[in-house]
Regions:
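Periplasmic/extracellular, small/polar-rich flexible segments of pilin-like filament-forming proteins
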Residues: 5, 63-127
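Conserved catalytic core of two-component sensor histidine kinases
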Residues: 28, 55, 62
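N-terminal single-pass transmembrane signal-anchor helix
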Residues: 14-42
Length: 127
């Protein structure tokens, strides 16, 4: 006569498939921590990129105006009279004639570190 040894429930080998709840919670906490660090940094980079876009448009507009002035000996009444300048998407560039040979440009776009930048042809600086 043969006897079969029956293992109790606690003695049976349990397959270890998947992750435990604690492991999943630790992974979620680590992902949350990384996101808390990365998202503000990304937003800062995004704002700085918008600033660079506005400053680039100011430089490009001033180059187009100077080219127009060199050819026509007069400043353009508007940026539409210049050739080759098209503002970046979402950037609004405006031209103000200060005198017969000086002007001010303003570039604005929401989302930058400041709402707009200004270029003055007299000083050659933007702020």
């Amino acid at each position: 006569m043969q006897f079969h040894h029956v293992k109790s429930f606690s003695e049976r080998a349990k397959p270890k498939d998947g992750f435990t709840l604690v492991e999943i919670l630790v992974v979620i906490a680590v992902i949350g921590l990384l996101a808390a660090i990365a998202i503000p940094q990304f937003m800062s980079y995004h704002s700085e990129a918008i600033d660079a876009e506005m400053k680039s448009d100011l430089r490009n507009a001033s180059i187009a105006i100077e080219a127009y002035y060199a050819k026509q000996s007069v400043l353009p009444a508007s940026l539409a009279e210049t050739t080759g300048f098209h503002p970046s998407g979402g950037v609004t560039v405006s031209l103000v004639i200060v005198s017969t040979n000086s002007y001010t440009l303003n570039a604005a776009k929401p989302g930058g570190t400041q709402p707009s930048f200004t270029y003055e042809s007299i000083t050659g600086s933007s702020h």
